[in-house]
Amino acid sequence: MIITTKGDILKSNAQAIVNPVNTVGVMGKGLALQIRESFPNVYNIYRNACKLGKVQIGKMFVVSTGLTSHPEYIINFPTKKHWKEKSKLWYIQQGLDDLVEVIQQRNIHSVALPAIGCGLGRLDWNVVYEVIDMKLSNLPDSVVVFVYEPYFGREGKKRPSILQQYSQPHKMNWR
């Protein structure tokens, strides 16, 4: 079951929080920095794994927080190879496939998922959300995925989805 929400993902009661990361071991901005500051042990494990080449695009790098309360896991989700790069939709698609496997293998019943790749990664939220919905909607109803929508500024406006934008021929931009 997918539930969209807003707010501070670190205050989520979900069993696992997804953390968008790169594969070079830097958690310098955004949610990754907040995770680094809140869970220094998770950061150290992730950084060392990056040095060993164990954090790869398309594969979740799961770290136990060691907490008896939530979150039990931080699921590091590589959305870009280097922190200087933009995210690629292909990376999100591959990663979501692996996230489904991780959720099932670890019997995770609730996940807090940010707008992966849409902040510093600069992907379009409407497109990414459609991919999230497509990839995660087949999870059992006993699994709850809290999808945290991005903040778009004071107006809080979202652009129409890609499907809506291009549903009529006269709206297509062929440049």
What is each of the regions a protein language model found here?
Residues M1-R175:
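Macrodomain-like recognition of ADP-ribose-binding/processing modules
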